[in-house]
């Protein structure tokens, strides 16, 4: 019996294992994402989906992570914000960070390194797609290059020195290959500007969008040049240009990650990039928004009200001429609801829409300059000492016009 058992084991251990090395049918591969124009365009759309929602108070750290606005509570009947507002309250931490665009989570819907990986996959595989014209292929490639620069830039704004993701690390890479170093701010900026210069010189992007119902929000040449200008402006700013506060920020190879010597030439480069971006925008139909709609008011409105409406609708009117890059998937209605005050009890029917939560602090209000262009505590014609006095708003202004009419 023992001999039979040994023979049985030897027979089965000597069999070949090739029958296990079979890939099942109908398994999706990366090739399938680029085998038609439609599937390739879907992958292009995927590269866009990682764009953070700038108007989303919980996703954009610039919205509430400072003290420009403040909530009376982080949770109430109308809204909740337990991410960026907690950063403003000093609750940011390293173990489970808020607005974690590094890994995704805590207010950040995605890891932007995943976004960069998808961008690289697209750039590596959009080679010969059936049904895709060469002109369109080149445009798509440059769109994704700009997105790649944008995602790097967003990470740099949040974390300073970051790893540059030029190409994807293979899935089967060794542990040592996956341990990448963060690059210095100067190296990151150099790489991003080189990437954008490559796009600008190739001139494959449109100057403006013709098909507004299907392509609004897609990358254009003014967007690429504006992004380059923003990157160079941040590089030239005191944050990363000779900032001694970052003198101890070095990697384990002893390399300084933020340059410690102020370089005025960075402002020259930034100025040139800004001028080029402005010229490109103006040449492609972008200009300061002006309110020019007809209002059902006898005699119309005066210049002051028109100016106020121009400032207001520059924010609220979608895809107006002043906007260089508007992301069509972004939802701004909630932000406007949070900002909307409740003027009186007569508006009780609108209480579900006017949430009165997003408001500037008095500290921010006092930083505004007077009409003479100086801080309020330096303007001798402004009664700084009486700034907290309660005053009655007049029904009519100096032009004898009803203050509340509009």
Enumerate the language-model features and the residues they cover:
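A general lysine-centric signal
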Residues: 2-3, 148, 228
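Bacterial Sec-dependent N-terminal signal peptides
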Residues: 1-25
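Short edge-strand/loop segments of extracellular domains
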Residues: 168-173
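A short linear-motif detector with a strong N-terminal bias
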Residues: 12-13, 30, 102, 143-144, ...
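Terminal low-complexity, poorly structured segments
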Residues: 1-6, 60, 75, 95, ...
């Amino acid at each position: 019996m023992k001999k039979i058992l040994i023979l049985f084991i030897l027979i089965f251990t000597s069999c070949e294992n090739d029958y296990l090395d079979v890939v099942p049918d109908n398994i999706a591969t990366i090739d399938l994402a680029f085998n038609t124009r439609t599937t390739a365009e879907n992958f292009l759309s995927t590269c866009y989906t990682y764009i953070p929602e700038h108007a989303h108070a919980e996703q954009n750290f610039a919205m509430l992570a400072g003290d420009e606005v403040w909530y009376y509570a982080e949770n109430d009947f109308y809204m909740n914000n337990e991410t960026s507002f907690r950063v403003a309250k000093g609750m940011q931490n390293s173990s489970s960070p808020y607005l974690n665009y590094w890994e995704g989570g805590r207010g950040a819907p995605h890891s932007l390194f995943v976004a960069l990986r998808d961008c690289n996959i697209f750039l590596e595989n959009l080679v010969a797609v059936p049904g895709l014209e060469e002109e369109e292929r080149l445009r798509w490639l440059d769109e994704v290059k700009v997105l790649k620069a944008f995602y790097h830039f967003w990470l740099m704004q949040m974390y300073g020195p970051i790893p540059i993701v030029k190409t994807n690390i293979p899935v089967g890479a060794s542990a040592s290959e996956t341990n990448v170093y963060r690059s210095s701010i100067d190296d990151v900026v150099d790489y991003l500007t080189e990437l954008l210069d490559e796009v600008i010189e190739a001139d494959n992007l449109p100057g403006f969008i013709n098909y507004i119902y299907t392509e609004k929000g897609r990358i254009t040449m003014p967007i690429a040049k504006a992004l380059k200008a923003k990157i160079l402006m941040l590089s030239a700013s005191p944050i990363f240009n000779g900032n001694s506060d970052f003198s101890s920020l070095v990697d384990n190879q002893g390399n300084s990650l933020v340059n410690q010597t102020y370089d005025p030439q960075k402002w020259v480069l930034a100025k040139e990039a800004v001028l080029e971006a402005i010229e490109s925008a103006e040449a492609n139909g972008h200009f300061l928004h002006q309110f020019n709609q007809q209002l059902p008011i006898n005699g119309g409105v005066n210049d002051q009200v028109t100016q106020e409406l121009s400032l207001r609708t520059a924010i609220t009117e979608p895809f107006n001429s002043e906007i260089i890059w508007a992301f069509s998937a972004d939802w701004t209605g909630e932000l406007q609801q949070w900002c909307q005050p409740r003027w009186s009890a007569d508006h009780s029917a609108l209480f579900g829409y006017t949430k009165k939560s997003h408001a500037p602090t008095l500290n921010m209000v006092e930083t505004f300059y007077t009409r003479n262009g100086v801080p309020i505590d330096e303007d001798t014609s402004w009664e700084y000492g009486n700034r907290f006095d309660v005053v009655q708003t007049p029904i009519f202004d100096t032009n004898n016009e009803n203050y509340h009419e509009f």
